[in-house]
């Protein structure tokens, strides 16, 4: 696989809390040059990113970031608002407390609520922080995510201490 072919599978991401509009503009310029699958940014920069990207590049937004401990209603509202502001993909961080507590029904309800808030045309990626989980927790979190509407499962935010 060539670098150009590989780029079509990558998300170019900038989620640092101190990221500036100039940083996001640079992210989008690089994404356009590399022709990546998507960029991922925080909700506050969605309109800027949307205006700077080629139409072939998806715009992903993090939800419940970075801890995943937000209330389900907040995640649903944040997701719907992100789509309204130009996101075509949602990267939702799971509530690790639900995973550690084996509260699989509640986790499923949360994922399903976000799925319903964004509809079926928006890609939903669920971030599980796999380095912080046992193999059994990873398997269950993945099953719950896919069963409740996730299009992808991602391993990490890159912000968890593990």
Model segments located where?
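Alpha/beta enzyme core
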Residues: 1-34, 38, 44-162
């Amino acid at each position: 696989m060539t670098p150009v072919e590989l780029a079509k599978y990558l998300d170019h991401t900038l989620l640092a809390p101190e990221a500036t509009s100039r940083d996001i503009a640079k992210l989008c310029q690089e994404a356009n040059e590399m022709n990546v699958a998507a960029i991922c940014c925080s909700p506050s920069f969605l309109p800027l990113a949307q205006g700077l990207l080629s139409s072939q590049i998806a715009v992903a937004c993090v939800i419940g970031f970075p801890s995943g401990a937000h209330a389900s209603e907040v995640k649903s509202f944040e997701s719907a608002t992100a789509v309204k502001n130009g996101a075509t993909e949602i990267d939702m961080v799971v509530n690790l407390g639900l995973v550690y507590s084996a509260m699989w029904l509640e986790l499923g309800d949360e994922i399903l609520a976000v799925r319903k808030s964004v509809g079926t045309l928006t890609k939903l990626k669920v971030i599980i922080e796999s380095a912080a989980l046992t193999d059994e927790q990873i398997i269950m979190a993945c099953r719950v995510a896919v069963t409740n509407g996730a299009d992808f499962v991602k391993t990490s935010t890159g912000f968890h201490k593990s």
